[in-house]
Amino acid sequence: QRCGEQGSGMECPNNLCCSQYGYCGMGGDYCGKGCQNGACWTSKRCGSQAGGKTCPNNHCCSQYGHCGFGAEYCGAGCQGGPCRADIKCGSQAGGKLCPNNLCCSQWGYCGLGSEFCGEGCQNGACSTDKPCGKDAGGRVCTNNYCCSKWGSCGIGPGYCGAGCQSGGCDGVFAEAIATNSTLLAE
């Protein structure tokens, strides 16, 4: 199931952002330019740039006044939320898992997108970057991950959008995450 304009106006669960392409997640690909609903940066300004407003859902307020997770929000210059000292997952939090099968970044924050699910991802729906698809003998990805048009496994628009070869293409994986959220919640 898609979100936003592509999903008949549907909103993402847990205040995740709906990207310009109609997929749910967190990070720049989802909450930045073109974000349709959820914790969009354009609509969720914070800190000194927004009269001291705080971010919803315990997100960090970056030095530039945008809400989100990861080093660019919770690191140097962070104005509010779980700034560096309040780690949420992974080895920085005693092996704690993220809710809803979100990825735990190398910095110990929960979210979706390459900054969370890519290199250094500790747990959750991490991108495996294993070869798949027609150039890998028809290999499919595990855990219903999407096989991108370039032949790598992962989730998000870059994997499950246009050209997706197999797995949870067109946002089916995001729907599965939302469906299983009660099983994975803290």
Swiss-Prot record:
| Residues that carry a glycan | N180
Q: Give the matching InterPro entries.
A: Chitin-bd_1, Chitin-binding_1_CS, Endochitinase-like_sf
Q: Which residues form the propeptide?
A: 172-186
The entry's substrate-binding residues are 10-12, 62-73, 114-115
Highest taxon of the source?
A: Eukaryota
A Gene Ontology MF term for this entry? chitin binding
Residue limits of the Chitin-binding type-1 domain?
Answer: 1-42, 43-85, 86-128, 129-171
The keyword Heme belongs to this UniProt entry's keyword annotation: no
- Classification via PANTHER family: CHITIN-BINDING LECTIN 1, CHITIN-BINDING TYPE-1 DOMAIN-CONTAINING PROTEIN
Other facts = The 4 sites proposed for binding to carbohydrates (N-acetyl-D-glucosamine) of receptor molecules are on the surface of the agglutinin molecule.
Q: What is this protein called?
A: Agglutinin isolectin 3
